[in-house]
From Swiss-Prot:
Keywords: Cytoplasm. The lineage of its organism: Bacteria, Pseudomonadati, Pseudomonadota, Gammaproteobacteria, Pasteurellales. Belongs to the YejK family. It comes from the Bacteria. This is Nucleoid-associated protein CGSHiGG_07705. It comes from Haemophilus influenzae (strain PittGG). One of its GO terms (molecular function) is single-stranded RNA binding.
Length: 338
């Protein structure tokens, strides 16, 4: 699949330190980049890399300055270059409040992918390396790192314009622990948290469990339904698609003459029609897992009360029939002790 780059520009943010004072200065390009095959290939790589990142959803606050200028851009009141220059200065002012941010190249690109318009914004690092020139001499070079980036956001312009009540038109990369990347980028955009995929996935799991309970299913039947839900969600995840609530409901058995989607609506679970799947959360549909105090356990839910017994009084698990590789390790350890 390819993308269509409509407008793209690069600006630089340079960090200047004067004693305890930190200032981010912007070096602005005075014209847009020409859209060449190299530029399109770069944006395709950035698009694919962003798709694989862990992201959070956001929405613009009512007084967002960035959103006001974005709206002027979409209404064709200002040009993309002017919008990008203003946004760069706005980000520079915000970055000056943090001491962990370094210099970088800011890329702003308006592109189309699968009939959807996007605005992509990312702060990219530069890396130093070596190259061999035509005379076979070694020279130092500097290149833009488009494979590793964690300061980026993307706005679904199509969704923003078509659905004013959407809570997922803006996504941004979740910051690493100990760094407030998400914080300053949200402040720069004038945005706040929108859809929470983790909460949506957890509510979906609870709804499935409650649906089975109200249908008075036995253990085996409940596990079969949960496995069916998991297989559907896993398929959506593998294909890069969201969980479609009505589509999922159509694939499940109707319990007490009530489809699953109707049950979720009547019980007010607050589920979206389209839910971004989270693999780690969905695994609990078919597995029990946990770790702590040097122990990590994971096993299929159907094994509980068959091969695996839990005694809540003594807080112990009894496993009948260890995995061969684990058993082999234990036997070797026992022999070495003797």
């Amino acid at each position: 699949m390819s993308i269509t780059v409509n407008q793209i520009v690069l600006h630089q943010l340079v960090k200047n330190v004067d004693g305890d004072s930190i200032k981010m200065e912007s070096v602005l390009r005075d014209e847009l980049l020409s859209i060449t095959p190299e530029v399109e290939q770069m944006m395709l790589q950035l698009h694919q890399g962003y798709q694989n990142k862990a992201k959070a959803f956001g929405v613009f606050q009512e007084k967002s300055i960035f959103a006001q200028h974005l709206n002027r851009l979409l209404e064709q009141e200002i040009e993309f270059l002017g919008f990008s220059q203003y946004s760069t200065k706005l980000l520079a002012d915000e970055l000056g409040k943090y001491n962990f941010v370094e210099s970088g190249t800011l890329i702003l690109c308006q592109y189309n992918f699968l009939a959807t318009d996007y605005l992509f914004i990312a702060l990219l690092d530069s890396r130093h390396s070596m190259l061999v020139d035509e005379h076979l001499d070694i020279r130092r070079t500097e290149y833009l790192d488009i494979t590793q980036f964690d300061i980026a956001a993307r706005i679904n312009l199509t969704d923003l314009q078509v659905n004013a009540n959407s809570n997922r038109y803006l996504t941004f990369i979740k910051g690493r622990v100990g760094r407030k990347i998400s914080d300053f980028f949200m402040d720069f955009l004038g945005a706040e948290e929108g859809l929470n995929p983790q909460v949506q996935n957890q509510c979906l799991l609870q709804a499935v469990s409650d649906y089975c309970d109200q249908g008075e299913l036995n253990k085996e039947q409940t596990q079969a339904v949960k496995k069916q839900v998991f297989e559907y969600c896993k398929g959506q995840l593998s294909n890069g698609n969201n969980i479609k609530l009505r589509e999922l409901s159509d694939s499940l058995p109707t319990l007490n003459e009530q489809p699953f989607v109707v049950f979720t609506e009547e019980q007010n679970y607050g589920l979206e029609e389209s839910i971004p799947p989270i693999r780690s959360t969905l695994k609990s549909l078919t597995k029990f897992s946990g770790s702590g105090k040097g122990v990590t356990l994971s096993f299929d839910a159907e094994l509980l009360n068959t091969r695996i017994q839990w005694d809540p009084m003594t807080d112990t698990l009894t496993i009948k029939g260890l995995p061969p590789n684990l058993k082999d390790q234990l036997q070797k350890a026992l022999k070495s002790e003797n």
